[in-house]
């Protein structure tokens, strides 16, 4: 099947700091699904998270450093400019106005999908985008009734649908699930333990220069 309109992807998160556990799956999804661009979107205030440990500017700059050599990855700063909690549905409405003819793929992990029915206005989200679910190989279905029904209705196994249909599909993509977390990195730094090979060197150097997470 020919691709009619190459989709774009969005990956949101606190990224405090960004690390290879974010970056490797993002790259794999971009390549596997032939996304024309993947936008890394740091949250300003995530409704379900406590205050971050680096400022919005610092988190943004770390993302830019981490993806500086990836031609198909860029940062989207819109949520950092908000002065209120950022909900996914609000961002998707903005994006659909900006990209009216381009399929939008919103990327999330399996843990987010499992609790998807707790998201603000969750039933409307698939009216603006496709959902790409990043998961480890061999995952098992643990959905509740509502999420299970949503998946049954909207799932596709044909990645061409993500380009040829504007919105409304759920696609599962196996990715490398690296056992790295931002919390772990902050804890190691607080204990003066090296974080080499957990995040790009450019991010490590920035953390040192800014004296973050101490």
From Swiss-Prot:
Its EC number is 2.7.7.18. Keywords: ATP-binding, NAD, Nucleotide-binding, Nucleotidyltransferase, Pyridine nucleotide biosynthesis, Transferase. Disulfide bonds: none annotated. It is an enzyme of class 2 (transferase). Belongs to the NadD family. It catalyses: nicotinate beta-D-ribonucleotide + ATP + H(+) = deamido-NAD(+) + diphosphate. Pathway: Cofactor biosynthesis; NAD(+) biosynthesis; deamido-NAD(+) from nicotinate D-ribonucleotide: step 1/1. The lineage of its organism: Bacteria, Pseudomonadati, Pseudomonadota, Gammaproteobacteria, Alteromonadales. It holds the Pfam family CTP_transf_like. HAMAP family: NaMN_adenylyltr. InterPro entries: Cyt_trans-like, NadD/NMNAT, Rossmann-like_a/b/a_fold. This is Probable nicotinate-nucleotide adenylyltransferase. GO terms for molecular function: ATP binding; nicotinate-nucleotide adenylyltransferase activity. It comes from the Bacteria. The keyword Heme does not apply. GO terms for biological process: NAD biosynthetic process.
